[in-house]
């Protein structure tokens, strides 16, 4: 069967192809809408809560589409910034008006936070604040509350009214029941809010969700004392900074691993708390999840510290499925924390074309965030794997790291500590002193600092500044300093606390050379 079209003939296949292309083109230009299925909770008592959320999503979805389409129709929305912002505001206002006048004009407290959910949420939060995660939870709440917003304390907003109350911190959101992407948790004082993410209005609230007086500490579980030693040089504590620790080649199950783990706990409790730890590979030498991971780091795990792993040459691929390593079944992955994008690579396969292609896209929307990669094998090193670094890893990965404007790379593999001078704009650290037998250090021309000693690292990112420390099991400082993401950041004046830190840093490590800035 053929169809006449102008001066020629098109067969059915061509018609179908053109129709399909037209449909795909329309779909590609459609505004984004999140999935409409509410995530499942493992707690059966929360089924009524899930049902209430699903009803809300189903009720609002048609108006959500209308709001998104209205935003698409804002003139010049993709051009000047003001027009793009107008499109966002249009989407927000159309849906907010529909919620207030058509969809939920008589909504009241408890419509979504049904009684069984209210009971479960209050119970879980009380238990969490009374447990070993107390310090991280109170730190996170204090940080979010200290935003200068008038709504960060006091009574919750009325339902269907706009609210810019701070979001619940991720460490607390993990305790709460899962909710669809159309909604988000926020808080005002002790009240927990459900806020529509598109409309930015409160759709329900739960009074007295947060414990009234969180316990000051957890009696009976202080860290085992490490003599009378305290951390050598606590980092400054600016508002909004993110802090994390790093360990490499740690999974020995031997005494040095336990000593490094104990030093990390001492630092965590006595100096500065870090919510997560990057593991730089060789996490489990003998595939002993209990002896080489759970036992040494249990005090940190119990306090809510997350570990995020990269695979080393002694690790089995099955580790990607081990939930405490937070790899999400992937041997390369990314995540954002504060002003940084973290990218874990599998350097066991440095030339893997799929990984290389993914790396070229993962920073596409990173903007002004720090770009931080972590993986096992270093590109530059001065231990017994120096030739492998030079001849295998560097040729495979350096061009991609430079091309994607990576700021810092953390690696292990060499059982020592090194800070490498910037190479083509990229700063490299080797931190493989987490517990395995040490390697000899042979200085190279690219080394700024190097020493063969067990250690862990702590890093703090504050805007465009990054402070770092390398610390031994005896709480001695191996290295410390400051790096800057941009030349402009380097030219800005440093605050008094940072200047004090750097002065102490210089006096504490007389053998070390000063850290140069990127």
Language-model segment annotations:
Residues 90-167:
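Mid-length scaffold segments of soluble, non-membrane domains
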Residues 30-32:
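Bacterial signal peptide processing site
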Residues 218-228, 454-518:
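A short C-terminal boundary segment appended to hydrolase-like catalytic domains
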Residues 225-226, 272, 285-371, 384-408, ...:
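Extended active-site neighborhood of metal-dependent phosphoesterases/phosphodiesterases
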Residues 215-291, 382:
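N-terminal active-site segment of His-dependent metallophosphoesterases
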Residues 34-74:
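Immediate post-signal-peptide N-terminus of mature secreted/exported proteins
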Residues 190, 249, 281-282, 305, ...:
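Active-site glycine-centered loops adjacent to acidic/histidine catalytic or metal-binding residues
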Residues 17-27:
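Bacterial N-terminal signal peptides
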């Amino acid at each position: 069967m053929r169809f006449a079209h102008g001066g020629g003939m098109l067969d059915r296949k061509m018609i179908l192809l053109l129709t399909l292309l037209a449909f795909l083109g329309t779909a590609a230009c459609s505004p984004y809408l999140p999935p409409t299925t509410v995530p499942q909770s493992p707690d059966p008592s929360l089924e009524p809560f899930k049902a209430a959320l699903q009803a809300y999503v189903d009720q609002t979805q048609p108006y959500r589409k209308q709001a998104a389409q209205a935003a698409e129709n804002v003139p010049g929305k993709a051009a000047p910034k003001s027009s793009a912002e107008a499109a966002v505001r249009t989407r927000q206002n159309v849906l907010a008006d529909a919620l207030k006048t058509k969809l939920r004009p008589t909504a009241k407290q408890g419509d979504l936070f049904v009684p069984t959910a209210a009971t479960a949420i209050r119970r879980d939060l009380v238990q969490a604040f009374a447990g070993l995660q107390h310090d991280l939870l109170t730190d996170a709440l204090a940080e979010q509350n200290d935003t200068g917003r008038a709504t960060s304390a006091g009574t919750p907003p009325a339902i269907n009214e706009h609210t810019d109350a701070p979001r619940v911190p991720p460490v607390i959101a993990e305790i709460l029941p899962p909710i669809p992407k159309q909604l988000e948790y926020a808080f005002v004082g002790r009240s927990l809010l459900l806020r529509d993410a598109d409309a930015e209005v409160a759709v329900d609230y739960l009074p007295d969700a947060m414990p009234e007086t969180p316990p000051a500490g957890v009696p009976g579980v202080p860290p085992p004392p490490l003599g009378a030693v305290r951390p050598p040089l606590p980092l400054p504590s600016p508002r909004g900074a993110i802090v994390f620790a790093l360990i490499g080649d740690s999974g020995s199950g031997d005494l040095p691993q336990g000593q490094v783990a104990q030093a990390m706990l001492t630092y965590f409790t006595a100096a500065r708390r870090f919510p997560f730890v990057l593991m730089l590979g060789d996490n489990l030498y003998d595939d002993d999840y209990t002896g080489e991971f759970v036992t040494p780091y249990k005090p940190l795990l119990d306090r809510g510290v997350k570990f995020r792993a990269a695979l080393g040459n002694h690790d089995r691929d099955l580790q990607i499925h081990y939930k405490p390593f937070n790899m999400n079944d992937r041997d390369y992955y990314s995540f954002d924390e504060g002003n940084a994008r973290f990218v874990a690579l599998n350097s066991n396969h440095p030339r893997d074309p799929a990984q290389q292609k993914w790396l070229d896209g993962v920073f596409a929307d990173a903007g002004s965030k720090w770009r931080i990669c972590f993986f096992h094998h270093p590109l530059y090193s001065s231990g017994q794997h120096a030739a492998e670094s030079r001849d295998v890893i560097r040729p495979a990965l350096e061009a991609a790291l430079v091309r994607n404007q990576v700021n810092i790379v953390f690696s292990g593999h060499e059982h020592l500590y090194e800070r490498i001078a910037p190479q083509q704009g990229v700063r490299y650290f080797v931190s493989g002193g987490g517990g395995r037998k040490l390697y000899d250090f042979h200085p190279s021309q690219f080394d700024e600092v190097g020493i063969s000693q067990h250690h862990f690292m702590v890093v703090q990112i504050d805007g465009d500044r990054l402070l770092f420390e390398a610390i031994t099991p005896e709480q001695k400082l191996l290295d410390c300093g400051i790096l800057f993401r941009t030349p402009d950041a380097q030219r800005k004046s440093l605050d008094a606390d940072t200047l004090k830190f750097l002065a102490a840093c210089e006096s504490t490590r007389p053998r070390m050379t000063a850290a140069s800035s990127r």
